[in-house]
Amino acid sequence: MSTTFQNGLYRTTLALPESPKSVPEARLVLVQMTNEHPHPVVVLPNGVTDNRWTFGNQGFLARDADWLKSLVSLPRQGFYTLTRELEIGAGAKLPEGLLVQLGYTADARPVIFPGQLMPGNSIQFASRGALIGDLQLDFLKVNEFRVLAPPATSTVAAEPASNVN
């Protein structure tokens, strides 16, 4: 297996030959190389928290090179800025420069959650987002920033806002 394989989120376009019922086509998966196996490991999402999928600890080995080539790479879940105005259906438009959170459906369709300034000087992202097409992913610019942990658990160390997974 090539060591140039990129760890990250993918959309399956074919069922995984080794486990077609567990990993069907059109599914969001996390694919990672590990030190334990010469082949990438395919991990399924196991839940959503704050518009972000979490992934389990166990996965399926992907031994089929053609299957790996069929995967569609997806941008990481996290926070982005719109680089242009974006129409999200029914005439609704989101302005250029808007802070959004990117997530996915279980079948790996991209969803954006617009940020909204709330009382108390906080930004909130809705629990329901707007589906966007793959081509519209090009209108997102990643935001890299850090925030302090909540006061109850705060030490003073900053934690990444995390564009992880």
Q: Which residue stretches match the model-derived regions?
A:
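N-terminal helix-cap/turn-to-beta initiation motif at the start of protein domains
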Residues: 1-7, 69-78
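A short linear-motif detector with a strong N-terminal bias
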Residues: 21-22, 58-61, 79-81
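Short, surface-exposed polybasic-aromatic patches that bind anionic ligands, especially phosphate groups
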Residues: 72, 85, 89
